[in-house]
Structures are given as structure tokens and as C-alpha cells.
Amino acid sequence: MVPLWFTLSALCFVGAAVLLYVDIDRRRGLGRRRKSWAKSHGFDYEYESEDLLKRWKRGVMSTVGDVTAKNVVLGQIRGEAVFIFDIEEVATVIALHRKVGTNVVVDLRLKGLKEPRENDIWLLGAIGPRMVYSTNLDAARRACDRRMVTFAHTAPDCAEIMWNEQNWTLVAMPVTSNRAQWDEGLRTVRQFNDLLRVLPPVPQNGSQAALPRRGGSPSRPLAPTPAGRRELPPGRADVPPARGDVSRFAPRPEAGRSDAFRRPPPARNGREASHFQR
């Protein structure tokens, strides 16, 4: 009896070793294929990234814990950053950066998949083979035009979940996806990103610029002008004239001319003015 148990234990050990070798070889093969695919597109490749997944929290990201992104590819599409990476045993994700961010989240996923786990997102309805969820149903309804309907029907089945977060648009595919499906995922995330441009942008804080100062040094700000008081031009004093002060109505003496002698005004029709007193 003892030899039988010993033989069974040995067989189990050999089987476990074979499965472990196959799994390691599969992972290495996936890494080699991903690296070769990245090189063919002019992208960069690294084996893993610890901080990459901290950028997102929705979609498939809400179902994983503190994990590390594997087989990470970094590149650019039309001047915008793009990441392709694996969440081990969960999904392969493609993330495309957006020029203009939005606070409205639109989640488009195949029917039959579990609904989003977030508490701030609601079901909008079905478009063909996919269900639409959003954090703003009115904005998402405006985005679901004819182009979105066509896209929902023609998007490949390998793009199981599509969603956006702030300045990113993401697509989740099966972790067993191949090179051809990665190319389809790139095209899909670009199309979905273009369709989401109609969403309201993130409001900009401090959009109103400060009023420029006049005649003041940056290191010495001007004192605020009291209410109801206007600035006067140079040479004018801001003192109201007294009621009995008639000097304000007196003509100013002309330069180079004495007050002792005043020339009479010119005569009209050859005669002197009768009202002028010498």
C-alpha cells in the first residue's frame, strides 16, 4: 500500500511541475509576442509597472486589488499617449489619453457581463449587443447618436468593456487576446475616444484673469481706490472748491504778458467797442 501512495505522490509532483513549466512558458511567450508587437509599431516595452494601475479605478479596474501591470507597452497615437498592458488573469487593457478631460463617465459593455460596481453610475439602456451606463444620463443620451449606434454594432467582440475616466479612454479585452486583436483594440479605442468628444469638458478653475495694474510696481501693489472716487489726471487736486471761492472762475494770466496793460479788443467796422473802458 505504501508503494502505491508513494507512486501517486510522485505522479502528482511531476504533473504539477509540468503545469508550472507550461504556465511559465506561456507567460514568457506572451511577453515575447507583446514585445515583438510593440517593436513593430515603434512602441516601448517593459515587463511590469507598479504605479500604472493607480491612474484608473473604473471598468475592470474596480474588480482588481493591489496588482501590478504586466507586459506594458507605451506609445503614441496622433500625439496622445497610449498604454497596452495585462492585468494578470483578468484582462488586457488599452488606455488612450484624451486632450480634453470630462467628468462624465460612459461605460459600454457586452450584454451578459456584470454591471459596473460603482455606486454613482446608472443604466441608460441597450444599444445593439451592448449595455450603456453613465454617471450623467442626459449627457450620455446626447452622446448616443447614430454614430454611437453604428459603433456599438460594429465594434469587435474582443472589446468586451469600453469606458472613460477623466483624460483617458479605455478598452478591456480577454487576457488571451492575440496580435490581431490588439490591433483591433487600438482602432476601437480611437473610435470610441472620438465619439466621446461631445461630452462636457472639465470646468477650468480660475479662468478669469486678474485685472492689470496701472502705474504700480509688482512688488508694491496699489492701494484700493475708495468707492465713488475716480482717478484724476496729473496736475489736478482731488479737493472740491469752496462755494465762496471765485478764483476758480478767474482767467489765468498769459505767459509773457503784464496785467497792467490790457490791449482793447479790435474795433468792428473801423470803430472801437463802446463798452470797453480804458
UniProtKB/Swiss-Prot annotation:
Q: Name one GO cellular component term.
A: plasma membrane
Residue ranges the record marks as coiled coil: none
Bilayer disposition of the protein: Single-pass membrane protein
Question: Which parts of the sequence are annotated with region: Disordered?
Answer: 200-278
Transmembrane helix: is it a keyword of this entry? yes
Q: Any transmembrane segments, and where?
A: 2-22
**Which compartment or compartments is the protein found in?**
Cell inner membrane; Cell septum; Cell tip
Question: What role does it play?
Answer: Required for MmpL3-dependent trehalose monomycolate (TMM) transport to the cell wall. Required for growth and cell elongation.
Q: What is known of its domains?
A: The N-terminal domain (1-205) is necessary and sufficient for proper localization and function of this protein, and for its interaction with MmpL3.
> What is the protein's quaternary organization?
Monomer. Interacts (via N-terminus) with MmpL3; active trehalose monomycolate (TMM) biosynthesis is not required for the complex formation. Interacts with MSMEG_5308.
**Name of the protein described by the UniProt record:** Trehalose monomycolate transport factor A
Q: What lineage is this protein's organism placed in?
A: Bacteria, Bacillati, Actinomycetota, Actinomycetes, Mycobacteriales
- What is the primary gene name for this protein? ttfA
